[in-house]
């Protein structure tokens, strides 16, 4: 099994790779307090729905460690406030709120513990969230590689690799699994404007893993589909609604429409923690609006005239009818998705409750 880079971990405090600096610089950030965790998520030092969920869980554990509360009840009050602050950083990715709620639930369920014992219990839960995420990613890889068995040219968008998770990735997991089995596979990597996660992160990850790749600009994808050089598309997700509508990085919907026009399957890979059964469909998913400077600049270099009007929705929603299959750690769901997604979430919850 190939080694994969760890994205976020605990070493007395939450530690993470500053993904804004990749691939030029591999820099480790140590978050010494809750505010630094919040800033790391908001500024996209850490990004990717599962990874920010793990980071938020560590943020809750850190808030407990740093709190001067002398009783468990006071600590619970501090944790509720920490959850609210963390949840507000990135509204589209449901894994964040899922992780902070899980941490709060554990705190409430263990409120009879002495306060120091409760702090340790919370850290153990955050570590469990991290470890379970990596295990889920590897399971996604094993399930998903079956769908890629006949695909030699796969297109992916944004970064849903190890950098977006605890390790190994979601959309890149089946690609890694095929490669580890010794089968040939080639990946078309969308650069993913405006933050360039594909160019900076996915291409770098695949290169590190020794997987054949070609970097393309986003507006080249249709050309390669038209030329018959794309066998399938696989992407991650930041939130999947109960009906199977998928929120993912801006540009995913456009790829889905193109895939439908060219009869190319579109696969979505995500852990069950990304499935939001409380959100009926994509229309109810909040779409984060990010900084205009991320559009007008690349790094510190301006590429547009000063003072122009800019729109920057960070995500779009792909309707369920454009999705061929959803790959989770519990298996593969096919349309219609609603009943299967509910069953998968229930199975995952039952498995977690038994640990």
Curated annotation (Swiss-Prot):
Pathway involvement of the protein, from the record: Amino-acid biosynthesis; L-methionine biosynthesis via salvage pathway; L-methionine from S-methyl-5-thio-alpha-D-ribose 1-phosphate: step 1/6
Binding site for substrate: 47-49, 90, 197, 248-249
Organism: Herpetosiphon aurantiacus (strain ATCC 23779 / DSM 785 / 114-95)
Listed transmembrane segments: none
Function of the molecule: Catalyzes the interconversion of methylthioribose-1-phosphate (MTR-1-P) into methylthioribulose-1-phosphate (MTRu-1-P).
Protein's name in the database: Methylthioribose-1-phosphate isomerase
EC number(s) given by UniProt: 5.3.1.23
Keyword terms: Amino-acid biosynthesis, Isomerase, Methionine biosynthesis
Chemical reaction(s) catalysed: 5-(methylsulfanyl)-alpha-D-ribose 1-phosphate = 5-(methylsulfanyl)-D-ribulose 1-phosphate
Gene Ontology terms: biological process: L-methionine salvage from methylthioadenosine
Keyword Isomerase: yes
Residues of the site described as Transition state stabilizer: 158
Active site: 238
EC class of the enzyme, as a word: isomerase
Family listed: Belongs to the eIF-2B alpha/beta/delta subunits family. MtnA subfamily.
GO molecular function: S-methyl-5-thioribose-1-phosphate isomerase activity
One Pfam entry name: IF-2B
